[in-house]
Amino acid sequence: MLRAAIESLAENFSDAVIAPLFWYLLLGPVGICGYKAVNTLDSMIGHRSDRFLAFGMVAARLDDAANFIPARLSGVLLALAAAFVPAARPFAALATMWRDAAKHRSPNAGWPEAAMAGALDLALAGPRRYHGTLVADPWIGVGRARAELPDLRRALALFVLACVIAAGLIVVALILLLEA
């Protein structure tokens, strides 16, 4: 359960924080509204099932495209945040991200999840039961597969600090734009 919470925290850092900011900075209110519409459609109908195949596939591919850059930025921001979180490993976060991100079934979720796995010395994803069916996903990261409460606390610290770093970078960019 803790491992799943850490995976969700990493993926949602990209989907719920960085991607909306990215699209807002790129296209303003239209960008964030468009992104949230695509992301919500993917959540609602972007499933691999007969029922949603026709429309769901389009929603899923649009979401993949919209998250391509934000997911990679998210991984880098989590690795940067790891430099300031006790016992976190920023270089391992980067190495794990480069090595393992493509192992994830999603073309984007692997980037922040791999960065989180490396930073915390955990193995995320891996074999699991999903709706009663065993899913044999590969492991992301080479650390412990069993996450503990201190790991979740450090994951939360990484999440919060990465949000602060992202906000700081936006402020710096805005100041530079206003001075230009």
Language-model-detected regions and their locations in the chain:
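Hydrophobic alpha-helical transmembrane segments
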Residues: M1-L41, G46-A180
